[in-house]
Amino acid sequence: MVQGFDPTLILWLNLIGTFVFGLSGGLAAVRARLDLFGVLVLALVVALAGGITRDLLIGTPPATFRDWRYLAAGGAAGLVTFAARPVLERIWNVIQVFDAAGLALFCVTGAAKAVEFRLGPAPAIILGAITGIGGGMLRDVLIRQIPTVLKHDLYAIPALAGAAVVVGAHGAGSNSLAFPFIGFAVCFTMRLVGLRFNIQLPIAPSERRTKSGAVEVPRAPDGPADGGSFSQRP
């Protein structure tokens, strides 16, 4: 747990983030024409897989299996998505804002938990990012897509940046409560700016030969990115 934070507050913030991430998985499942069970599975995967992966890599029992409320939040998100998809579609921009907040929260708390277990700076930053993006990556694998965080959308980078703030502050010997908030703000702001201005990471051009034998190097697409774990509609 982040030092100095009210454990009850952190719990409820994590549950809110779990619910919002569950909406992402549920919407992806509904669009993939999965049945109710499939919707629930994908909602739980997106909501919980990042934290489970982090805890297993650290070597501690996953928090998901020690507190039933995490499973309840993810499952509730799946049921809400299954029953109310049209409503969720209409408020998509609002959900994206909450998702950005969930990503920021999870990367900060994930990095803080790794630091508590005395991991080095690089592993702690990576585990912080995994906490935020791991569920979306597994979701894409289950619906047979290239994980969207591996493409050119700003999703993993903000998570890494937010986690780096927390880990860097700890490495400098600071226990100030300001740094978790700063890490949250960095990740949250980067994510929203990336969405607002469609900021994308560059991709390598691919070579293609024309009928005359000349090499044609196509430009990278100018359209919107496929999105991160929740950047666009899954």
Language model features with spans:
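C-terminal ends of transmembrane helices
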Residues: 22-32, 52-56, 79-92, 137-148, ...
